[in-house]
């Protein structure tokens, strides 16, 4: 199909090139237009039959379309026939312009022909394949052709392999009740499902009741529920100076952040003791300056 289309396109381009090389005589065009006006005025609707249109198209399709196939080479009749001869394409194009069916607003009938000029069989059958657009309600879909419908196989009986018969048809449903029925059914089923789930939750079985512990309250603990007081951690700092090492030991509250350097931190939780067994004997414990963080330490 693609080769035939390419073949016709090439031949059409050859005709266009020939017309550009030798344009039509203006007198021929005027005579063709005058003849068309005379025929169109006296024409009636009864003369616009399909047989006449088919005959007109047969006469038109002969000049510029050669009888050779896509694989054969042939010269178009649109070329000149010598210096003294007349251009046959001019006369035929004038007849083509004079065809009133090309300017008619009525429905045109088109026919397909092969390269020999004969009508292609089976082309008109393609019109019956077209499906009319419209509502799809009440339309049944049937599979297979006439031979399959008239076959001896009964669609109602299961096949030898045991598969169940399938109904490929569709029952007509009115559009007015289709959407409402679906919504009603879905609503009833959902409501019934919710009621069943609620009834199951209320039913308790012996020995299978799930006991969920209560959520702990966010209230502050009482005096009896206070946690154990936090203690101290021992920290050591080593300082080297001219081959000598100075060791500094101290305690910091456990709740304080561990930092680099000699930092005497301050309790931030309010529950750590001031001294412990390790730092109670440290010298200058009463005069020690407690810092909360490094920013509080003077330089």
From Swiss-Prot:
Zn(2+) 2 binds at residues 255, 267, 269, 272. Pfam families: Paramyxo_P_V_N, zf-Paramyx-P. GO terms for molecular function: metal ion binding. Keywords: Host cytoplasm, Host-virus interaction, Inhibition of host innate immune response by virus, Inhibition of host interferon signaling pathway by virus, Inhibition of host MDA5 by virus, Inhibition of host RLR pathway by virus, Inhibition of host STAT1 by virus, Inhibition of host STAT2 by virus, Interferon antiviral system evasion, Metal-binding, Viral immunoevasion, Zinc. Gene3D superfamilies: 4.10.80.340. Signal peptide: none annotated. GO terms for biological process: symbiont-mediated suppression of host cytoplasmic pattern recognition receptor signaling pathway via inhibition of MDA-5 activity; symbiont-mediated suppression of host JAK-STAT cascade via inhibition of STAT1 activity; symbiont-mediated suppression of host JAK-STAT cascade via inhibition of STAT2 activity; symbiont-mediated suppression of host type I interferon-mediated signaling pathway. Its main location: host cell. InterPro entries: Paramyx_V_Zn-bd, Paramyxo_P/V_N. Residues 137-160 have a biased composition (Acidic residues). Residues 137-186, 205-229 are annotated as: Disordered. It comes from the Viruses. It is found in: Host cytoplasm. Zn(2+) 1 binds at residues 232, 251, 276, 279. GO terms for cellular component: host cell cytoplasm. Plays an essential role in the inhibition of host immune response. Prevents the establishment of cellular antiviral state by blocking interferon-alpha/beta (IFN-alpha/beta) production and signaling pathway. Interacts with host IFIH1/MDA5 and DHX58/LGP2 to inhibit the transduction pathway involved in the activation of IFN-beta promoter, thus protecting the virus against cell antiviral state. Blocks the type I interferon signaling pathway by interacting with host TYK2 and thereby inhibiting downstream STAT1 and STAT2 phosphorylation. Highly virulent strain of Rinderpest virus can blocks the phosphorylation of host JAK1 kinase, thereby blocking the type II interferon signaling as well. Belongs to the paramyxoviruses V protein family. Interacts with host IFIH1/MDA5 and DHX58/LGP2. Interacts with host TYK2; this interaction inhibits the type I interferon signaling pathway. This is Non-structural protein V. The gene is P/V.
């Amino acid at each position: 199909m693609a080769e035939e289309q390419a073949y016709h396109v090439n031949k059409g381009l050859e005709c266009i090139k020939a017309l550009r090389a030798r344009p039509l005589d203006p007198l021929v065009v005027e005579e063709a237009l005058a003849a068309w006006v005379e025929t169109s005025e006296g024409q009636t609707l009864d003369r616009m039959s399909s047989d006449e249109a088919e005959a007109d198209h047969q006469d038109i399709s002969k000049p510029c379309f050669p009888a050779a196939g896509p694989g054969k080479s042939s010269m178009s009749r649109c070329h000149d026939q010598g210096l003294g001869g007349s251009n046959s394409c001019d006369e035929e194009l004038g007849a083509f312009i004079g065809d009133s069916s090309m300017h008619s607003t009525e429905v045109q009938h088109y026919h397909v022909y092969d390269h020999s000029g004969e009508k292609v069989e089976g082309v008109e059958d393609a019109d019956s394949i077209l499906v009319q657009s419209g509502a799809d309600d009440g339309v049944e879909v049937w599979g297979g052709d006439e031979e399959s419908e008239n076959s001896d196989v009964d669609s109602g009986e299961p096949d030898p392999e045991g598969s169940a018969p399938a109904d490929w048809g569709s029952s007509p449903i009115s559009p007015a009740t289709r959407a409402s029925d679906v919504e009603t059914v879905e609503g009833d089923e959902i409501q019934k499902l919710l009621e069943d789930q609620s009834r199951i939750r209320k039913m308790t079985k012996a020995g299978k009741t799930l006991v969920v512990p209560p959520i702990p309250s966010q209230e502050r603990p009482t005096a009896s529920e206070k946690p154990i007081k936090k203690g101290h951690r021992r920290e050591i700092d080593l300082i080297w100076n001219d081959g000598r090492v100075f060791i500094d030991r101290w305690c910091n509250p456990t709740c304080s952040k561990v930092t680099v350097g000699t930092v005497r931190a301050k309790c931030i939780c309010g529950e750590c003791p001031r001294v412990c067994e390790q730092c109670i004997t440290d010298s200058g414990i009463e005069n020690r300056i407690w810092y909360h963080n490094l920013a509080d330490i003077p330089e």
